[in-house]
Swiss-Prot record:
Belongs to the DMRL synthase family. InterPro entries: LS, LS/RS, LS/RS_sf. 5-amino-6-(D-ribitylamino)uracil binds at residues 22, 56-58, 80-82, 113. This is 6,7-dimethyl-8-ribityllumazine synthase. Signal peptide: none annotated. The gene is ribH. It comes from the Bacteria. It comes from Lactococcus lactis subsp. cremoris (strain MG1363).
Amino acid sequence: MTVFEGNLTTGNAKYGIVVARFNEFINAKLLAGALDALKRHGVQEEQIDIAWVPGAFEIPLIAQKMASSDKYDAIICLGTVIRGSTSHYDFVCSEVSKGIAHVSLNSNIPVMFGVLTTENIEQAIERSGTKAGNKGFEVAVGAIEMVDLMAKMS
């Protein structure tokens, strides 16, 4: 029996990060967490590119653009969608998650889902570096592991 498992080894892997500007006060913390994780695991600044997009809905398009460039070993998608009083939240969350999954499956590279989908601002704050940790950090660690796993399986 063969068991494949990714390790937290980075080598020369290149990472693209797509960050939504809407809810920037939360997303900047997610980005800081992602950058912290990558750097702690030996990724150099020249191995990281960051693209800012207007909102979460635009994340999949730029993730696809990055993935199709063949420059990146993984794409990290960061954003925050907070429930409001209309159904807009449900549509945005659904389309962003589908779009990110679509990019990953069609590009054959890890496209990591670091988009917070919360009921309120307090939950978003908790998940961007306080009580519930920093999801940006967690997603970046997952990206490192997935890059290594993909390399082992090729």
